[in-house]
């Protein structure tokens, strides 16, 4: 059920990050080196989740693994225990909550018309549903963290935090962001470009689907313009 996936990615997954933030308040702040294995594990886990995304053929699995990679960055930022790190983690959790939920919503609109989640079978939608293609493009750009979205602000804060703590982490972060951009564009091109392989009749997009996407993207853009509401 797509509603379950949307709630899971947008809200329940963030409860783990909230729990870590609460636990860190009772931990010793000066001994970040104690948490070094967890920090390396979080960044390495983010890269492995990104690499797993690259070889997914199932659209829903791809979006689910992308959520895991973003949470790796959140955990790494929280472990550093600096104000910038916590702000970046909070911002990324909120931004990714909107983005991943929107991606699951779009995956469902595609599934309702094709009855398959295999990437190679869902191609060619830019000719059939051009407005849905616009939503796909906007959501994937948010997932890549292009400015002026909240995703960009949060990843910039996390990158600054980790770079100040240890400049070497920029290699892992850069690699993670490069792979994120790769699989996001791969997902967009696989589902929207080319010629449709399925020969069945496709329903047009409904107003409720456009409204759902507006309710995901507009609040995120408004928070991006006034980030002091959350960080």
UniProtKB/Swiss-Prot annotation:
Pfam families from the UniProt entry: Proton_antipo_M
InterPro entries in alphabetical order: NADH_UbQ_OxRdtase, ND/Mrp_TM
Homology family: Belongs to the complex I subunit 4 family.
Coiled coil segments of this chain: none
Keywords: Electron transport, Membrane, Mitochondrion, NAD, Respiratory chain, Translocase, Transmembrane, Transmembrane helix, Transport, Ubiquinone
GO molecular function: NADH dehydrogenase (ubiquinone) activity; ubiquinone binding
Catalytic activity entry: a ubiquinone + NADH + 5 H(+)(in) = a ubiquinol + NAD(+) + 4 H(+)(out)
Source taxon at top rank: Eukaryota
The organism's taxonomic lineage, starting at the top: Eukaryota, Metazoa, Chordata, Craniata, Vertebrata
EC number: 7.1.1.2
Key word RNA-binding present: no
Primary role: Core subunit of the mitochondrial membrane respiratory chain NADH dehydrogenase (Complex I) that is believed to belong to the minimal assembly required for catalysis. Complex I functions in the transfer of electrons from NADH to the respiratory chain. The immediate electron acceptor for the enzyme is believed to be ubiquinone.
Keyword hit for Translocase: yes
BP-aspect Gene Ontology terms: ATP synthesis coupled electron transport; electron transport coupled proton transport
Name of the protein this chain belongs to: NADH-ubiquinone oxidoreductase chain 4
Subcellular location: Mitochondrion membrane
GO cellular component: mitochondrial membrane
Gene name of the record: MT-ND4
TM region positions: 1-21, 34-54, 61-80, 84-106, 118-138, 156-178
Membrane topology: Multi-pass membrane protein
């Amino acid at each position: 059920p797509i509603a379950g996936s949307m709630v899971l990615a947008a809200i329940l997954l963030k409860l783990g990050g909230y729990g870590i933030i609460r636990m860190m308040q009772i931990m010793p702040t000066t001994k970040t080196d104690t948490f070094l294995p967890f920090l390396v594990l979080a960044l390495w886990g983010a890269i492995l989740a990104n690499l797993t995304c690259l070889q997914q053929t199932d659209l829903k699995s791809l979006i689910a693994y992308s959520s895991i990679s973003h949470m790796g960055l959140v955990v790494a930022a929280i472990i550093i225990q600096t104000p910038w790190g916590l702000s970046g983690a909070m911002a990324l959790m909120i931004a990714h909550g909107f983005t991943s939920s929107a991606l699951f919503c779009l995956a469902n609109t595609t599934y309702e018309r094709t009855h398959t989640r295999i990437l190679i079978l869902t191609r060619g939608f830019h000719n059939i549903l051009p407005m849905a293609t616009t939503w796909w493009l906007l959501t994937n750009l948010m997932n890549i963290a292009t400015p002026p979205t909240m995703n960009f602000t949060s990843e910039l804060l996390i990158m600054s935090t980790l770079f100040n703590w240890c400049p070497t982490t920029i290699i892992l972060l850069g690699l993670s962001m490069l792979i994120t951009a790769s699989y996001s564009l791969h997902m967009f091109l696989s589902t929207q470009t080319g010629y449709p392989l399925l020969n069945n009749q496709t329903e047009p997009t409904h107003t409720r689907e456009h409204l759902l996407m507006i309710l995901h993207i507009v609040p995120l853009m408004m928070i991006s313009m006034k980030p002091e509401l959350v960080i």
